[in-house]
Structure formats: C-alpha cells, structure tokens
Amino acid sequence: MLAPMDTFRLFLHVLAASVWVGGQIVLGGLVPTLRKISPEAPKLAAQAFNRIAWPAFGVALVTGIWNMLVVEDLDQALFGIKFLLVIVSGAGAAIHIVGKSKAALAVGGALASVGAIAAMYVGLAL
C-alpha cells in the first residue's frame, strides 16, 4: 500500500496525463465532425482544449520529476526514455499550435499524439 502522499502524487500524475493524452485522442476524433460544422470550429475547439491541456501537461511534468526524485528503485534509463517522449509530445503540440502549413500541423499533431501515447505506455512499465 502506498503512503498517502505517494497516492496523491501518483493520482495527480495519472489525472494530468489522462487529460493530456485522452484529450488529444478525443479532439482528433472530433475534428472531422467539427470541420462539417464550420471551418473555424476545429481551431476554436483546439484553443479551448489548450486552456486545459497545457496546465495538465505542466502538472504531469512536475509530478513526473517529483516521482523521479522520491521513488528509490526507479529505473532511470526507462524514466529517461519516458521523459524524452514527454518532451517530444510537448514539442509536437507546440509545433501544431504555431504551424502555418498543413505539413507542420500534421507533423506536430502526430509527434504530440504518438509521443504522448508512447510516454503513457513506457510509464506503465515503470
């Protein structure tokens, strides 16, 4: 059984990661429908998502570093891989936000989603 603070830290981490990863998956699924509503609808939905997603990304990042500092038997190599995937996901999302071309939007979105899903998978191995 985990200590109460460990449970709280892990809860915050999983909740934040779920918002970041799950939100990308849900928004990706909604884009075709949003495009039918209005050409601007996907952009407006993405902007609304960003107001929730980026704070969640920050919480996941902070609690992930917190985990690294307090978990004694943490596999450092595996944690390093996960951290790199998280950075790839965040960078991809940033590229997707500022990208002007279809290629930048596609590459940024793919990096964000694949990096996030891969980080979640590696996190389960920790």
Q: Whereabouts are the PLM-identified features?
A:
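Polytopic transmembrane helical bundles with strong interfacial aromatic enrichment
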Residues: 1-126
